[in-house]
Amino acid sequence: MKQTKYIFVTGGVLSSLGKGIAAASIATLLKNSGLKVSILKADPYINVDPGTMSPFEHGEVFVTDDGAETDLDLGHYERFLDESLSQDNNFTTGRVYQSVIEKERRGEYLGKTIQVIPHIVGEIKDRIKKAGEGKDILIVEIGGTVGDIEGLPFLEAIRALRLEVGKNNAMNIHLTLVPFIKAAGELKTKPTQHSVGELRRIGISPDMIICRSEKALDRDLKDKIAISCGVEKNCVIESVDAASIYQIPLNFLKQDILSPIAEILDLKNLKPNMENWDSLVKRVIAPSNEVKIAFVGKYVDLKESYKSLTEAIIHAGAALDTKVELKWVDSEKLENMESAEVFKDVSGILVAGGFGYRGVEGKIKAIQYARENKIPFLGICLGMQLALVEFARNVLKLKDANSSEFDEKCQNPVVYLIDEFMDTNGEKQIRTAKTPLGGTMRLGAYKCDIKEKSLLAKVYNEAKSVKERHRHRYEANPKYRVDFEKHGLIVSGESKGLIEAVELNCHPFFLAVQFHPEFTSRLEHVNPVICGFIKAAINYEDN
C-alpha cells in the first residue's frame, strides 16, 4: 500500500492568523496538480466537539454529510477542495480522551497504566493515519498556538509520526505573524524567531515558514527569517492581507510554494491548473454588478457565526458576476425598529438560523415585511420555522402560534420537538426535551423530495430530489399543513413526512428551507438555493 505523505501545519505568536486558509490553499494547489489530497483539523480544546459551544465562543459549527459537528475550518477545506469531508477529518482532545477512556473501561489496554505517552499520543497518531488512508497527501492542521499546554500531545504526535514515516514522507509548515509597527514604520521578525524557537524546544523544526503580514516582505527580510529560523530561502512564503481568501492559493502559486514542497516530499514537478479558479476570483474581486440584501440574524456582532452562509453568498455573487453587499440587521434590535426604514434600500431579505428565543420576534417582523412587500426572501433552518409562525399568526390569524422551543404551553405549536426520526445511518433516534444537547440533533445530509413545478424545483433545475445537510432539533408541525396550503403557503420539499421547504405561490421569490444549503456551497459549484435567491434579488433591483 502506497505511503501517504503528511504536511503538518502549526501556528505561532497568536491565534486566528489563518492556518485553515493556508492549509486549504496548499491543498487546492496540490489537488489541481493531480494529487489525491485531504485535510484534517486537530483541535486541542477539551470539548468533544463544538456542537454545544456558543457561536460567540467558537464561531460557526460546520456540519458534514455524515452528521459530524465540526470546526468552521472544515467548511474552508470543503469549499477550497470542492470535496465532502467526514467526522474523520476533525477531532478534539475531548474526543481523544473519551476514546482512550472507553478503551480502558473495556479492558483493551490489559490493565496497563494509561498515560499521555504512549496512549493519548498513540490515539492521535492513529486518527491522523486513518484520515490519510487512500490519499497521496494529508494536510494536518493543529489548532491553537505553539506554546499552549493543551496542544503538547498533538505536537508530540506529529513529531513522532514524522520520524515514523521518514523524512521524504512528511514536512512541517509553521504559520507565524510578522507585525507592522506603525511607530517605527517597519515589519518585525522577532515574534517569528521566538515562535520557531518554541517549536524547536518541543522537538519540531519547520521546513517552511508562512509569514502573515499587513504588508509585503522584501527579499532581505525573507532572507533574515530564513537564516534565523534555519529554513531554505525559498521556504519563506509571505501571506499578505488579501481582498478575498480565494486569492491566497494564487498568491502562494506566484511565490512558487510548490517547488520546495515537491522537493521535500519527493514529488514530481507540480503544475496546477488554476484557470477556472482564477477567473472566478476576478469576479469575486471586481464584479460587473452590485446588489444589496439584508442579513437578519442574532449573532451579527460575530460574523464568523455565519461563515458558510457569507461564503456561499460570495460564491453566488461570483457565479452571477455580482457583488452582494450585506446589510447586517441585528434581529433583537429590529424588534424596536421600523421595518420600512430598515429594509428600504435592500433587494432581498435573508433570515438565518439560530437557537433560543432572543431575537425571534425581530426575525418574524422581517419575514412579515418581506412577505407583504413582495421582497425576495430566503429563510434557513429557524428562518423556515419562523416563516411558518409568521404566516400562522398573520394570515391564519392564530395569534398564539409559536414554536414549542420558545413556548412549551402554546395552543398552536406550528413548530414542535420531533421525538422520533431516522438518522443518516437509517437508525431510529428518539428525543425528548430532557435529552442531552450534545450530538442529539437531526444532523447530516438527508434526501429531500421536491414538488414538481415548484419554486424549489426551479432553483434545483427540475430535480426530483436533492440531499442537503441539517442541524436542528425542532420540526414543522404537519397538523397545520392543510391550512397553510389552503392559504397559499405550499410545502415544496419533504423528507419521509417531514416538511423540508415551504414557499408562497403568489410572491416573486419567497422560499424557506429547513436544511442548510450553505454547507454544500463551493466557489466552483454554488448551491442552487443561495444562487436562486441572489438572482431573484438582482431581478428585483433591476425592476
Swiss-Prot record:
Q: What is the lineage of its organism?
A: Bacteria, Pseudomonadati, Campylobacterota, Epsilonproteobacteria, Campylobacterales
Q: What is the name attached to this protein's record?
A: CTP synthase
Q: Where are the transmembrane segments?
A: none
List residues binding Mg(2+): 73, 141
Stretches the record annotates as Amidoligase domain? 1-267
Write out the catalysed reaction: UTP + L-glutamine + ATP + H2O = CTP + L-glutamate + ADP + phosphate + 2 H(+); L-glutamine + H2O = L-glutamate + NH4(+); UTP + NH4(+) + ATP = CTP + ADP + phosphate + 2 H(+)
The GO annotation for biological process reads:
'de novo' CTP biosynthetic process; pyrimidine nucleobase biosynthetic process
Record flagged with keyword Nucleotide-binding = yes
